[in-house]
Curated annotation (Swiss-Prot):
It is a multi-pass membrane protein. Its main location: membrane. This is Putative synaptogyrin-2 like protein. Residues 20-170 form the MARVEL domain. Pfam families: MARVEL.
Amino acid sequence: MESGAYGVAEAGGSFDLRPFLTQPQVVARALCLVFALIVFSCIYGEGYSNTHKSKQMYCVFNHNEDACRYGSAIGVLAFLASAFLVVDAYFPQISNATDRKYLVIGDLLFSALWTFLWFVGFCFLTNQWAVTDPEDVLVGADSARAAITFSFFSIFSWGVLASLTYQRYKAGVDDFIQNYVDPSPDPNTAYASYPGASVDNYQQPPFTQNAETTEGYQPPPVY
């Protein structure tokens, strides 16, 4: 079981709600969800209005349907990202460091992507609202401004979340480097004998050398 991997202490501990709710990453994620809900609600509720000349409903952002669709889409998908709160709650129970790594990388990529998408959305909505004729907006002007404002706030909330997730990923990488042991053998260490090899315990029998030295030429016996 891995301990201390990716910014979390030991796996298998009991879940405590109060420390969980006070974690910076959980607070940032909650703000992201609230801002996304506000943007989606403003566009869906009062993002469409008719004009004095027609009863047909148009998007209040310069009658550009793409602006309303874009703001609603990223708001809904960002709200559905509340699934990562479940991951944050379950994360300390995951003992496999590889699973933790993939979850953190997925969270990091999603947070970075949504930071960029909120930036694009803020610029898009602001541009379309700037060229909107005020006479064409009978209702929904305040909601349009609120959608733009909280799109701007979402850039920073998702950026902070991406930064915190990167710190968690970096903590896991640093922990792996510190605990890594190089499996390559030390060149200064002598090789151990093969475990199945037999040890040669042969010893020279005693008196062999003496026997060899005495086995020289001997004169024949004299009769």
